[in-house]
Amino acid sequence: MNLLLAIAIFAGVDVYFLKDSPDLLVRVLPEIQTEQLTLYYSFSGQDWDSTVIEKEGRFFDAVLQSPDMPSIVGIYSVYDDYVDDNSGNLYLYELKLFPKMLMPFSLTDLETIIIQARKKIMARIHIDEAITLLDYADHMLSVVPYIKNSPNELRKNTLQIEVNKLRGQIVR
């Protein structure tokens, strides 16, 4: 039991900025033993790209060249017919190059932001804050990577509809 818990805690994807570079180091620790995996990634909703990486020590490391103005990177890996996509949510990270910032991110986070905006709009208080929250959510939804025909695509589209609906309720 403890071994399974340790695997669940330590397996997954970690992302780091390389020193003095906008490029990213992606480190994967697979849930099952394997010698090779395919890493899929998408910056800010661009087409998915992939790279095959081999095990070096305990980890699989890949360096991804960051585009000029990335907002978000989505990552998942495939190995031995197993898809590691963070339980269908992808591994998402919000990126800023200046100053450097790398923060885990999820559609659940956006959902929480939209709920907060809805509360402010319904209470008719702090409408300016609600507008800021909706602007942020709208921007992130426009660039968040997703796998076509996946539950995440449906969830993303549903959140976008909610943002548009809330914008229509704002009385300026």
Predicted regions and their residues:
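Glycan-association/targeting regions that enable binding to alpha-glucans and other polysaccharides
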Residues: 5-172
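Positively charged n-region of N-terminal signal peptides that target proteins for export
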Residues: 1-3
